[in-house]
Amino acid sequence: MEDLFSPSILPPAPNISVPILLGWGLNLTLGQGAPASGPPSRRVRLVFLGVILVVAVAGNTTVLCRLCGGGGPWAGPKRRKMDFLLVQLALADLYACGGTALSQLAWELLGEPRAATGDLACRFLQLLQASGRGASAHLVVLIALERRRAVRLPHGRPLPARALAALGWLLALLLALPPAFVVRGDSPSPLPPPPPPTSLQPGAPPAARAWPGERRCHGIFAPLPRWHLQVYAFYEAVAGFVAPVTVLGVACGHLLSVWWRHRPQAPAAAAPWSASPGRAPAPSALPRAKVQSLKMSLLLALLFVGCELPYFAARLAAAWSSGPAGDWEGEGLSAALRVVAMANSALNPFVYLFFQAGDCRLRRQLRKRLGSLCCAPQGGAEDEEGPRGHQALYRQRWPHPHYHHARREPLDEGGLRPPPPRPRPLPCSCESAF
């Protein structure tokens, strides 16, 4: 009798098992919990958004309190035009970083109430990002131009700062309109259908997908020819990066040339003492206040280039790559680089606070330590203290450079009144940006 359960009798049954993607199917393994609530990259992005938001609000609020405060301990020195430009930069940074981070956090955490609001929400978020980034860049350019005018033409006609600032805000809003119409919103991404078994290859990485329930903004360039994406990427790079960097390069180049031509000359070691008590700096040397403001403008320009360059470089590389035109707005790389670009708005106020003097003891100690590191020690014996820390007595007798004995004529031809010692130079510290 033939065995009914032998393999030769039973027909081969079709394989009706459904392949389960790793992390996307039902968790049928006993003793294990539910899958994570989101991808690690999304959680890290949310943490960075929160940190940048807190840092930006704290720094820019401090700058606004110092510049706009009345007479409290937060009030800083008043400089009319630069105060106005720095206040506008702080407001632009709050708008760029705070508005974008808040909208992005609300987008990620609250989810999507309706599918009909997808396009409006995506376009509004894109308008916030592009206009805030442009306003901050335009204010940095205006500060560099104002410093260039103050260094090269100190007695010339001042720049119309208020009109130029209003033009910068308006231009940022107008240039942000095209990016607002190249994105569209989708409903929350459902669970993707499983692919056929023949399409799965061993060792192949899983395809890029959206987390279930996550809302994404998609570009409109996927079904269009490739040159549409290239034209838009070129416009975005020129309007948001190339044009501001060109103006910043010209202004900072002029600042560096003036700084180099008016650099202070090293004093001679064996030069005889002058009859005047206070040796004023050479007329060709720039005042220390202008040098500090020049450094602040250069640092703001370098910070803008360093934070914005990765985003626009990756944008152009994705547009001109040989691969298929992917969804740039929905990729994780775009979101990560956008967070890096927002760090520019969070760090700008701390550049001003670093160069600006304050009443905080910790800040005074920091300036003292930095000044002792970056400033050359004065070699005059009259400026040195004794072994017990006691200073010379003449500092009480000639405390000011206008001591009246310095202007007396010689008593006779045979003898001259000994000149008073040179005044002690000011401590080299980053006290004020102006």
UniProtKB/Swiss-Prot annotation:
Keywords on record: Cell membrane, G-protein coupled receptor, Membrane, Receptor, Transducer, Transmembrane, Transmembrane helix
Protein's job: Orphan receptor.
Record family assignment: Belongs to the G-protein coupled receptor 1 family.
Membrane-crossing residue ranges in chain numbering: 4-24, 44-64, 82-102, 163-183, 238-258, 294-314, 335-355
Pfam family, one: 7tm_1
Side of membrane Extracellular, spans: 1-3, 65-81, 184-237, 315-334
UniProt protein name: Probable G-protein coupled receptor 150
InterPro entries cross-referenced by the UniProt entry: GPCR_Rhodpsn, GPCR_Rhodpsn_7TM
Organism: Homo sapiens (Human)
Bilayer disposition of the protein: Multi-pass membrane protein
Region Disordered, residue ranges: 188-210, 398-434
UniProt xrefs under Gene3D superfamilies: Rhodopsin 7-helix transmembrane proteins
GO molecular function: G protein-coupled receptor activity
Stretches of the chain found on the membrane's Cytoplasmic side: 25-43, 103-162, 259-293, 356-434
GO cellular component, one term: plasma membrane
Subcellular location: Cell membrane
Sequence ranges of Pro residues compositional bias: 189-205, 417-426
Compositional bias segments (type: Basic residues): 398-407
One BP annotation, GO: G protein-coupled receptor signaling pathway
